[in-house]
Amino acid sequence: EPLPLNLPLHQAEVAAVKAAEPVEAEPVVITAIPKDAMVMEAGQVKSGSTRFLNGSWRAMLEVTDPITGKPPYVRYQIQNNKGTARVVHGKNVVCRATVFSGLHSNGELMIKTRGNARCADGSRYPMPEITCKAGTNDVAECSARYDAKTVVPLTFRKAGA
């Protein structure tokens, strides 16, 4: 059937263009790196350098001393992958151990001691094997392994920063 030749005519209406709804931009969260955090600088790690480790570090261990109920005070002094660890635990018993460190080819930092720390009172204090890898913003994420079953989180803070 042919279409009618007289189309209905109406006054045209102007439709306002709808403005696009403003989309809330997700705020970019830039986490501040604590100035005393251990930063495993990517370039150094790639080249096998542990310069970022040189200096004095306070290790914050998530363990408690059975005598005081507080974590032991552990301080590492490291220069060119060699150094000492000083532990104060219990009723101010001071222990020392020789430490050495290095980078694995996978970029993990290892900090080890040869045996337990020797203490001023003649006792020995177990020292963990520490493993760190670069996390968010290259801040070191570390864990302290005392034995196959005991692994605790550990945070390094630059001493005197």
Predicted segments, located by residue:
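Amphipathic/hydrophobic helical signal segments and adjacent flexible N-terminal regions
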Residues: 1-52, 159-161
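Edge beta-strand at a domain terminus
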Residues: 28, 39, 97-108, 137-161
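Tryptophan-anchored aromatic micro-motifs
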Residues: 36-69, 142-143
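N-terminal glycine/threonine-rich, aromatic-flanked beta-hairpin/loop signature
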Residues: 63, 67-108, 142-145
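Short glycine/acidic-enriched loop and turn motifs that connect beta-strands
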Residues: 64, 118, 147-149
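N-terminal localization leaders that direct proteins to membranes or organelles
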Residues: 67, 116, 126-128, 151-161
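Broad, structure-driven detector of short, well-ordered beta-strand segments within folded domains
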Residues: 74-80, 128-135, 154-156
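Contiguous, well-ordered beta-strand patches that form the walls/edges
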Residues: 88-139
